[in-house]
Amino acid sequence: MLARSALRSGFLPSLTSSVKTGFCLKAAAPTLSMKWSAVKYYSTKHFTKEHEWVKVDGDVGTVGITSYAANALGEVVFVELPEPETTVSVGDGIGAVESVKSASDVYSPVSGTVTSINESLGDSPDKVSSSPEEEGWICKIKLSSPDELKSLLNDESYAQFCKEEDASH
């Protein structure tokens, strides 16, 4: 089992303070009006302060690590995936990402049941480095408590969080 996540242990902030790339701002796509409709709210990407993301389509969320985290980790060489049909809660460990620099646990941003995993990461873990928020997704989770999404960050809030985190180091 991995000790403490690199993201939670302070490795990420110390690394990002020496490698200022503005990556977080790139990860935060422009959004439409902040007037939230139920459809928009449940179909956008949400972020955690531990640098995971979830993009919801209906009642299934696709989960991965953010571009900010992938940039800090560097070249990913191994990805530990969760078992399909596993029931998870917010904050549960659902896998790990190992790079040439460090290893980091991946935590579930939502509660539910893992419905599928990105099996292509077994042969191509570098997808997490090159396309962390598209081809490098970790798993899909059928949501059991969609209201949990309200406690996550939207694009703009996540970008601000990353900017503040960079400034504090």
From Swiss-Prot:
Q: Look up the record and report any one GO term of the cellular component aspect.
A: glycine cleavage complex
Cofactor(s) needed? (R)-lipoate
Under the heading InterPro entries, the entry gives:
Biotin_lipoyl, GCV_H, GCV_H/Fam206, GCV_H_sub, Single_hybrid_motif
* Positions bearing Phosphoserine: 131
Q: Does the keyword Heme apply?
A: no
**Could you tell me which CDD domains the record lists for this protein?**
GCS_H
Q: Which Pfam families match?
A: GCV_H
The cofactor remark states: Binds 1 lipoyl cofactor covalently.
The Lipoyl-binding domain is annotated at 60-142
Q: Name one GO biological process term.
A: glycine decarboxylation via glycine cleavage system
> Which locations, inside or outside the cell, does it occupy?
Mitochondrion
The protein's job, in short, is:
The glycine cleavage system (glycine decarboxylase complex) catalyzes the degradation of glycine. The H protein shuttles the methylamine group of glycine from the P protein to the T protein.
HAMAP family named among the record's database cross-references: GcvH
Quaternary structure, from the entry: Component of the glycine decarboxylase complex (GDC), which is composed of four proteins: P, T, L and H.
By sequence similarity, the record places it as follows: Belongs to the GcvH family.
According to UniProt, the name of this protein is Putative glycine cleavage system H protein, mitochondrial
Q: Which organism is it from?
A: Schizosaccharomyces pombe (strain 972 / ATCC 24843) (Fission yeast)
Q: What is the lineage of its organism?
A: Eukaryota, Fungi, Dikarya, Ascomycota, Taphrinomycotina
Gene name as annotated: gcv3
